[in-house]
């Protein structure tokens, strides 16, 4: 009977452990600076991402197979749901939340000049913005 209570106590102690364990394949072997790393986007090309002040939202530019023009999205970090907040026309870049309130945001866009995507630059001589 005594062994039963000891076993039950041990199971309860280990079962109630609240510390999260991260099985994180994104962290490279030998990395000393990350404890955990979480991938937030899973499709398309995503770039220039910035968190709002309290870390609950992420603003970023992205495009997928439907369009080769980057558009601006805001993601709710907890749910992972993203919403396009730019016009969907032209191409966009350089989005930021207004600080410190972060209720507004700003970004650059070509949509007033043309609703279509601009021609892709020649990358043969290196990066072109």
Positions of predicted regions on the chain:
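Sec-dependent N-terminal signal peptides
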Residues: 4-13
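Short loop/turn segments that connect beta-strands within beta-propeller blades
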Residues: 76-80
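Hydrophobic beta-strand positions that form the internal "hydrophobic ladder"
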Residues: 55-59, 105-106
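Residue-level detector of Asp-centered blade-edge/turn motifs that repeat once per structural unit
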Residues: 53-54, 99-101
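A flexible loop/linker signature enriched in serine peptidases of the S9 family
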Residues: 42-45, 61-71, 87-92, 108-129
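Blade/loop signatures of beta-propeller domains
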Residues: 20-35
